[in-house]
Curated annotation (Swiss-Prot):
Residues 79-115 have a biased composition (Low complexity). It comes from Dictyostelium discoideum (Social amoeba). The keyword Lipid biosynthesis does not apply. Residues 69-115 are annotated as: Disordered. Keywords: ATP-binding, Kinase, Nucleotide-binding, Serine/threonine-protein kinase, Transferase. Residues 232-479 form the Protein kinase domain. Its EC number is 2.7.11.1. The keyword ATP-binding applies. This is Probable serine/threonine-protein kinase DDB_G0293276.
Length: 516
């Protein structure tokens, strides 16, 4: 149920006034037709996004949500970020409020020629436009994993929809005012709920509005003792991408080596921090302190330094895939990592070798939870746009369908293929070409071991409801001989050297640090 929060009462009533109503006529049928026009306006944005996927016919339903856009990082085209503030909106104007079923919303795409990668559509109805809206599920995504009692949001959404339906089924002009009251009450209830479930971290309404002061940011970010960049000695830059930059530092107080990640100061930063706090570090990177940069424009996250580097570095270093047993070990450990975060009702949404980092003991940990989502165990999470790296994105994400932990298992199938062969199964020179390859199932023809191939095929099932899950993955013949209880603590097959496991840059990073 979408909750309209931008002068919702005034705009709703003004919109209602523009629809001819027979106030002095008892003709209920005509009145119901008028009411149905108003209902169409509010229900248009929550219309189902379900799309069918098959090898013969691919249907792509463009969502009217303003969040469905892709931002391609110029320096790293395989890092994509959801762009909620795009200025390239494509406005579709309908001259009649009742004409919300635009036939252009359904496009056949045996190729992706009809897809606008920067699609940021907002359906503007004549005299009924300029609504600022979000759904409870979108709000969950926005505030992310600080929402401890996220199910309350879904209950609130269901209550609003049920009460609205009761009003829709009434007869009489008072329904307009009743409907306005529902939207007003829903906004108030949502605000109270968000403040309650985020009282220990952040008032989400302030975060969404971007109105937090520097002092409020520092209060939200406080994790342990108060720190500043002056407490660390910079060593080198060890990572850079669409998320920001990661540098190696030495903590002057403890003389411990740390990694500090620098990201934009927005609610996605708080989402990632809250996620990492919740996960605790057994299967994910540990965080110790969070604080603002000296210029107050960036968020700095002090994390454990994982000396082994990421799998992407080592794949690039060897130029081909890993030895079979090492690829199997890393795949198995990633399965355990996914088990852990999924039990916490979190979907990573960006599983790839770059985010699989090897710790000092030679075992895999996950990092970069900037795209992570909370999900409801009883129903899939809404799709807020194409998030992740093109080569690892699942079909349901590309088709703007609801998401579940199955999106991580699709990415695991891509990663497994890459760990074995050194390349990904779906390729292209641009993100669009990669997406077309994924949807058309055009894969690289590379011979691999029989059991490995069978598992990859099951992981890359285009239907998320039949895609193989954790239990069946662990029981697959490919993992015969793997002890799932001890693999994360046993002696690894190979342990990287303690140094030279990163593509480092000292001078360039110094300039960046000085700009903080």
């Amino acid at each position: 149920m979408y909750i309209y929060i931008n002068n919702e009462i005034e705009e709703l009533i003004e919109c209602a006034k523009k629809i001819p109503i027979l106030n002095n006529n008892e003709n209920g049928n005509d009145h119901n037709k008028s009411i149905s026009k108003l209902i169409t306006i509010f229900k248009s944005k929550q219309r189902s996004r379900s799309s069918s996927f098959s090898l013969d016919t691919l249907n792509f339903n463009l969502s009217s949500s303003s969040s469905n856009s892709i931002e391609i990082d110029d320096e790293n085209p395989y890092n994509t970020n959801n762009n909620n503030n795009s200025n390239n909106n494509n406005n579709n104007n309908n001259n009649n409020c009742n004409n919300s079923n635009n036939s252009n919303n359904n496009k056949n795409i045996n190729s992706l020629d009809n897809i606008d990668i920067n699609n940021n559509n907002k359906n503007n109805f004549n005299d009924c436009s300029s609504y600022s809206s979000f759904s409870s599920s979108e709000c969950l995504s926005d505030i992310g994993n600080s929402c401890i009692d996220s199910l309350e949001l879904f209950r609130l959404s269901d209550d609003i929809e049920e009460e609205s339906e009761m009003i829709f089924n009434q007869v009489g002009p008072d329904r307009y005012n009743d409907l306005a009251n529902i939207f007003s009450k829903s906004h108030k209830n949502l605000t109270i709920l968000l403040k309650d479930i985020n009282r220990d971290t952040l008032d989400c309404s302030e975060c969404i509005d971007g109105s937090l002061s520097d002092n409020e940011w520092e209060k939200c970010l406080c994790c342990g003792d108060i720190h500043s960049l002056g407490d660390y000695k910079h060593v080198e830059c060890i990572g850079k991408g669409g998320y920001g930059v990661v540098c190696k530092f030495i903590n002057k107080k403890t003389n411990e080596i740390r990694a500090i990640k620098t990201i934009r100061k927005d609610y996605s930063a708080l989402k990632e921090i809250n996620t990492l706090k919740e996960l605790g570090g057994q299967f994910t990177v540990n965080i110790f302190h969070t604080f603002l940069s000296p210029c107050k424009e960036k968020v700095l996250i002090e994390m454990e330094y994982l000396s082994g580097g990421d799998c992407a570095f080592h794949l690039n270093d060897v130029g081909v895939g890993f030895p079979e047993e090492l690829a199997k070990q890393y795949t198995a450990e990633t399965v355990l990592c996914l088990d852990f975060i999924h039990e916490k009702s979190i979907i990573h949404c960006d599983i790839k070798p770059n985010n699989m980092v090897i710790d000092s003991d030679g075992h895999i940990k996950l990092l970069d939870f900037g795209n992570a989502k909370k999900f409801n165990q009883k129903k899939p999470t809404s799709n807020d746009g194409i998030l992740g790296s093109p080569r690892y994105i699942s079909p349901e994400v590309l088709l703007f369908e609801p998401q579940s932990p199955a999106v991580d298992y699709w990415s695991l199938g891509i990663v497994m293929f890459e760990l074995i062969t050194g390349t990904t199964p779906f390729i292209g020179e641009t993100p669009e070409e990669i997406f077309e390859s994924i949807l058309s199932r055009n894969t690289e023809c590379i011979e691999i071991q029989k059991d490995a191939k069978d598992l990859i095929i099951k992981l890359l099932d285009p239907n998320p409801s039949t895609r193989i899950g954790s239990k069946d993955i662990k029981n697959h013949p490919y993992f015969n001989g793997i002890n799932w209880d001890t693999i994360k603590t046993s002696q690894p097959i190979w342990k990287p050297n303690s140094s030279n496991n990163f593509i480092t840059s000292i001078n360039g990073c110094c300039k960046l640090i000085n700009s903080f």
